[in-house]
Amino acid sequence: MYCQRLRQLRKAHKLTMEQLAEKIGIAKSSYGGYEAESKKPPLDKLVILARLYDVSVDYILGLTDDPDPKVERKNLKEFLEKPDIHWDGYKLTPEILDPIRKILKLVTANNN
């Protein structure tokens, strides 16, 4: 899937393989391998490509059809009110969460 997305994005941006390879700092043959799916692009190159095209890495990999790289923002206060929160497999009880909530309240109150 990534090979098709990379080809589609490159053509949409009117770039040759050589131009794109130069932009991301690799040989044309390496980039050609990505589009031919004979080579897998390393994560750092996927991130560079995603930024270059203003899409998400998930989009390039075919994990989503939404190219928008927006980060979903979550309200931590709402999250900490949920009844079933875990940290590294360990359930966080109200006794653990209450001091965390208090610290966050103090920190945010001092910054306002």
UniProtKB/Swiss-Prot annotation:
Pfam families: HTH_3
PROSITE patterns recorded: HTH_CROC1
Keyword Zinc: no
Gene Ontology MF terms in the entry: DNA binding; DNA-binding transcription factor activity
DNA-binding region (UniProt annotation): 17-36
InterPro entries referenced in this protein's UniProt entry, alphabetically: Cro/C1-type_HTH (IPR001387), Lambda_DNA-bd_dom_sf (IPR010982)
Residue ranges occupied by any HTH cro/C1-type domain in the UniProt entry: 6-60
Record flagged with keyword DNA-binding: yes
Key words of the record: DNA-binding, Transcription, Transcription regulation
GO biological process: regulation of DNA-templated transcription
UniProt name for this protein: Uncharacterized HTH-type transcriptional regulator YobD
The organism of origin for this protein: Bacillus subtilis (strain 168)
Taxon lineage: Bacteria, Bacillati, Bacillota, Bacilli, Bacillales
